[in-house]
Amino acid sequence: LIAAAHLGHDGVVKQLIAAGAPLDHVNNLHWTAMIESIVLGNGGARHQEVLRALIAARANTQLTDRMGTTPLALARSRGYDVMVAMLEKAGAK
């Protein structure tokens, strides 16, 4: 799920979610699929759709990276306004 999320493969992400892939798995960088869709994504339509799918599946929007930075703060720092709005609507802090 993490690899598909960072590459913006929204269709694969949706299939993996439907198959029961763990939404909040943390990798060795301490990143989740949600964080990778922001940090390694480009903020474009495919990464937005990945984020939308993760939010809809109820992935945890509060899990932070190793530095304690939330997905919302990561999206803000990159100027990904659509992703910021999606996260805020989902209740991210």
Regions found by a protein language model. Give the residues of each.
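Terminal, low-structured helical/coil segments at or just beyond the last alpha-helical repeat
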Residues: R66, L74-K93
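Alpha-solenoid repeat scaffolds
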Residues: L23, G44-H47, T61, V82
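Ankyrin repeat A-helix N-terminal signature
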Residues: A3-H9, E36-H47, L74-Y80
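Ankyrin repeat domain, specifically the short helix-to-loop turn at the C-terminus of the second helix
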Residues: K14-P22, R52-N60, M86-A92
